Amino acid sequence: RAIILKARQQGISTYCAGRVFWKTYFTPHARSVVMAHDSATSDALFNMSRNIIRNMDSLYKPTELRSNAKEIVISSPHFKKDATGEKPVSSYRLYTAGSPEAGRGTTPTIAHLSEIAFWQHDEKILAGLFQGISEAPGTEVILESTANGAQGEFYRLWRGALDGENEYTPIFLPWFTTSE
């Protein structure tokens, strides 16, 4: 579990999107969730995974069993057949944090939650999502955001991580670490 307080335009969201795709690609039965504060950002993060698949060499390219505006279901060439003779599948699902119920009822094994400090219903959405995420080995949660004042769930989780009061590893990436 990681919580990242970041500056803009450092490639952190791109890295996280790539990591989530990598975990989904190599983890049978992975259920990945990507959620951002607005639909344009959510779509951009989701399209990064589409571009990764599109640009993969055919030797490594996963089979897309379903692909639409909100979900990609893949079978990776790395997946081995299970006891029933079937190859497992993994999914990558897109949400936007526009409703207090966004993501509720899902059971992700991997979650990339972006710009949480700007979510309108941050407390309710995170409560619903966190109920469905197991503590089992292999699960992964990445919370990342630029700052938005000393308020809200992202701030509370960030302070808790700094104080060692929750399971998140705090990662601070200020603007001055990137030369422009």
Regions of interest found by a model, annotated:
Residues 1-180:
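Phosphate/NTP-binding elements of NTP-utilizing enzymes
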